[in-house]
């Protein structure tokens, strides 16, 4: 088999594995949902020029995001009132399920990952 055919076959096999693998598809869907939730709940207070500081997933490394969500999130946000979501504290405006998706998105796309992201 010549080199072009080998490369074409390898690319086709890889593409079919990605398309037919439900785990990869679910991961992509979860990342998209995490990004949407980050934009919806976090960005309006943590965007460029914000007095709260600009934060995107690639602002911190994975260990810093883990430490933030494990130790600092509740303390830093429980008294912050979120006018966008009915004037309740941020910790009440974001459900535990949504927070977990935001956490996963932030950690999976931190500065020290293969796919660092902003929220564009």
Residue spans of the language-model regions?
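Bacterial N-terminal signal peptides that target proteins for export
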Residues: 1-9
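Bacterial N-terminal signal peptides
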Residues: 10-17
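Electrostatic cytochrome c docking/interface patches
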Residues: 20-37, 53
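The canonical Cys-X-X-Cys-His
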Residues: 39-49, 102
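Short cysteine/histidine-rich zinc-coordinating motifs and their immediately flanking basic loops
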Residues: 53-60
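Short Fe-S-cluster ligation motifs
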Residues: 70-94
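C-terminal capping alpha-helices of c-type cytochrome domains
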Residues: 87-120
């Amino acid at each position: 088999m010549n080199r072009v055919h080998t490369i074409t076959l390898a690319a086709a096999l890889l593409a079919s594995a990605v398309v037919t693998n439900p785990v990869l598809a679910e991961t992509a869907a979860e990342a998209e949902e995490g990004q949407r939730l980050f934009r919806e709940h976090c960005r309006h207070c943590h965007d460029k020029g914000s007095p709260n500081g600009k934060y995107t997933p690639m602002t911190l490394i994975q260990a810093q995001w883990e430490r933030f969500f494990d130790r600092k999130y509740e303390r830093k946000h429980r008294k912050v009132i979120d006018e966008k979501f009915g004037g309740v504290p941020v910790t009440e405006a974001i459900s535990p399920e949504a927070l977990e998706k935001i956490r996963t998105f932030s950690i999976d796309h931190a500065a020290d990952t293969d796919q660092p992201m902003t929220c564009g």
